[in-house]
Structures are given as structure tokens and as C-alpha cells.
Amino acid sequence: MSAAEIKTNTDQKMQKSLESLKSSLAKIRSGRANPGILEHIHVDYYGNPTPLSQVASLGLADARTINVQPFEKTMVAAVEKAIRDSDLGLNPASQGTVIRVPMPALTEERRRELTKVVKSEGEDTKIAVRNLRRDANEHLKRLTKDKEISEDEERRATDEIQKMTDKAVVDIDKIIVEKEKEIMTV
């Protein structure tokens, strides 16, 4: 594996870490309706656990309400039950073929707890990015030791990996600040 491949591989893994952070933060309720928080819910569809997005269309009715419209009328009860039984603490209400999921307002205390969770997620992602940097640097040192790349190449690649790490950390901080702001907005 060359230094360029190591850099490319590390960059891809860092981007995956950022995407993972974004998806995990999307599941954190902020008081504002976001269909993304229902994505991980599975519905019992004729005996098979199926993602909610495959059995119903998700949309926003207003800033605090998500509309869930099952593709089959017979699935309304199952979808409603799956949402109610999820760990999100939501209380869906069925209106014919449409299920309305109101997002309850968050208390100040709950908002503060959620910001702590967000910070923790961000810190975990930063640790993952730093571990990727460490692994890449170790790999580069091995290549230098085995005389596959020169010390200058190693130094250049290490500097570039450090720049990628710094950029990823800045991106993580931006994402965290944005989510905290979203949570704290009443």
C-alpha cells in the first residue's frame, strides 16, 4: 500500500465517521419535527421486521408534526404500534389512513441533557478520527521502516493526514454547535 492509498483510505474513513455522526445526531429529538428520527423504526410487515420508510411515506405536517402515511391501509395499526413502542417516547394518533406524530416540546432540563449527549457523540467521533490518524501514521512508519517510501514522503503524508484530521475535527465541531443550537431553540 502506497502513501497515497493510505491518505485516500484515511480520508474516506474520516468522511464515514462524519456521516455516522450526522446520522446518529438525526435520531436525537430536538422538539422540531424531523422525519429522520423515525428511520430506524422497524414495522412488523407480514411477519418481517421492515424499516418504516419501506412501508409508509414520511412527511411534515407542520414544524412539530410528522405525517406517516402507510402504503397499505391494513398497516396503519402496525405502524402506529411500532412508533409508540419505539424508544423515542412519541405518541402517534391515527386519523384514517394518516398517522400524525406530534413532537412534544422539550423541557429546559431535557434540552441540557440532550446537549450533553450531542457533545458526547461529537467527542466519540473525534476520538475515532484521531484513531484513524494514528493508524495511518503507524502504517506510514511501517512503510518507511520497510524502505517502501522515503522519510520525506512519510513526513509529507503525515502532515497531510494531520491536516485531514484537523479539518475533520473542525467539521465535527460545526456539526455539534449546529445541533446544540437546534436543540436549545425553543
From Swiss-Prot:
A GO MF label: ribosomal large subunit binding
Any one Gene Ontology cellular component term annotated for this protein: cytosol
UniProt-listed Gene3D superfamilies: 3.30.1360.40, Ribosome-recycling factor
Pfam families reported for this sequence: RRF
Classification via SUPFAM superfamilies: Ribosome recycling factor, RRF (SSF55194)
Origin: domain of life: Bacteria
Any GO BP annotation: cytoplasmic translational termination
Subcellular location: Cytoplasm
UniProt KW keywords: Cytoplasm, Protein biosynthesis
InterPro entries hit by this protein: Ribosome_recyc_fac, Ribosome_recyc_fac_dom, RRF_sf
Family in the record: Belongs to the RRF family.
Cited function: Responsible for the release of ribosomes from messenger RNA at the termination of protein biosynthesis. May increase the efficiency of translation by recycling ribosomes from one round of translation to another.
Cited PANTHER family: MITOCHONDRIAL RIBOSOME RECYCLING FACTOR PSEUDO 1 (PTHR20982:SF3), RIBOSOME RECYCLING FACTOR (PTHR20982)
HAMAP family assigned: RRF
Protein name as annotated: Ribosome-recycling factor
Organism in which the protein naturally occurs: Polynucleobacter asymbioticus (strain DSM 18221 / CIP 109841 / QLW-P1DMWA-1)
